């Protein structure tokens, strides 16, 4: 296994980093700030260990149907189209933000799920291997099964997805504490 480092994310850490994140992404969209904050703080901790390159899992949800909203597309038989659309628009939706937030700390992200050959292969996998049905709460089935078959613990391989900004508590800190008293638009001037 890989060594795991755990850091508590506090209100003061989020507050102290907010201006840097908003300036890095150049927007005051709360969801983008929350996601950007997770990348920013993770890359900051990585940089503190003098590491310059990190691996990101970006692309897995778009390739293998990981987002909950894909269940509607599955029901309407439009999942393949939506996955392809999301892949085509991924740079402006996710990658640009993540790159800006990680590079603000001097850390370059590598994106193995966006390898050209893997993308071409994954986009041609039938949707039934990605989402098992319209009520599939886990999604990304082929990816989870592969991870488990390669030796990843079942509890980890089949753990329900939780967006980083929610799992870290950053979204809650931003909404309930930090942004109550701050006009983020000021950081964009």
Residue ranges, per PLM feature:
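ATP-dependent adenylate-handling active sites, centered on carboxylate activation for C-N bond formation
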Residues: 1-150, 165-179
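Long, intrinsically disordered, low-complexity Ser/Thr/Pro-rich regulatory/activation regions
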Residues: 183-189
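A short alpha-helix-loop-beta-strand transition element characteristic
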Residues: 153-160
């Amino acid at each position: 296994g890989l060594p795991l480092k755990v850091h508590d994310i506090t209100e003061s850490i989020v507050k102290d980093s907010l201006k840097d994140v908003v300036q890095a992404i150049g927007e005051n969209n709360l969801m983008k700030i929350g996601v950007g904050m997770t990348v920013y703080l993770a890359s900051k901790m990585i940089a503190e260990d003098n590491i310059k390159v990190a691996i990101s899992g970006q692309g897995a949800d778009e390739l293998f149907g990981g987002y909950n909203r894909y269940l509607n597309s599955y029901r309407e038989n439009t999942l393949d189209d939506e996955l392809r659309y999301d892949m085509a628009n991924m740079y402006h939706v996710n990658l640009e933000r993540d790159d800006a937030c990680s590079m603000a700390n001097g850390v370059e992200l590598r994106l193995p799920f966006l390898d050209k050959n893997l993308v071409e292969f994954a986009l041609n996998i039938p949707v039934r291997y990605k989402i098992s049905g319209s009520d599939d709460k886990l999604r990304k089935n082929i990816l989870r099964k592969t991870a488990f078959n390669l030796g990843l613990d079942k509890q980890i391989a089949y753990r329900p997805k939780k967006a980083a900004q929610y799992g870290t508590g950053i979204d809650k800190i931003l909404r309930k504490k930090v942004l109550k008293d701050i006009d983020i638009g000021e950081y964009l001037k």
